[in-house]
Amino acid sequence: PEDFQYILGLHEGAVVGMADGYALASGKPAFVNLHAAAGTGNGMGALTNSWYSHSPLVITAGQQVRSMIGVEAMLANVDAPQLPKPLVKWSYEPATAQDVPRALSQAIHTANTSPKAPVYLSIPYDDWEKPSPPGVEHLLDRHVHSAGAPDSRQLAALVKQLNDAVNPVLVLGPEVDATRANDQAVALADRLKMPVWVAPFSMRAETSLFPTPRSSTTKPLEA
């Protein structure tokens, strides 16, 4: 399509890393296309970072034509949905070519629904030649909304713990940045005058998680 910018990379690891950075910077799902099983394997090192960063990546991988998957012909990805696990939130190979548009739509919404994470979709090569099923255009109008809030009893217990604490500290994990809750973290720390720490091995930088300079130094906890 005219509004689709396709960027070719020399190695799947670099391509996944590029998409990861774009997804984190934009807050939108990034699309990555890998070369069958071998390309998926090459990209899984970078996919580890994407998983722990909660990056909304929609990863598609090529697959042999359907008639040749069972005989394990060259480039056949046997049991494709299992290959990227456990580094993806959802993985799938459509049972029929007509299910590909719906599966792509589900992949996009799943990657971008909290908690955000990479998803994986294996698509046989000959599926692209098949006609789309009737009504596929309605997928463009599909919207997914989610909402959640702590139970009032949980909030009351948390407030009591904070009020009773002698020297409370705030430890931030990567989801603070992934959910754009940075300002709320700053407000909470300032309200209770808490020092701020970053969880060990966090996949987000300290300045990204807690960007406001303050007297209480923001630094990572030692593992």
Language-model features: locations:
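N-terminal alpha/beta PP-like core and its mobile active-site loop of ThDP/TPP-dependent enzymes
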Residues: P1-A223
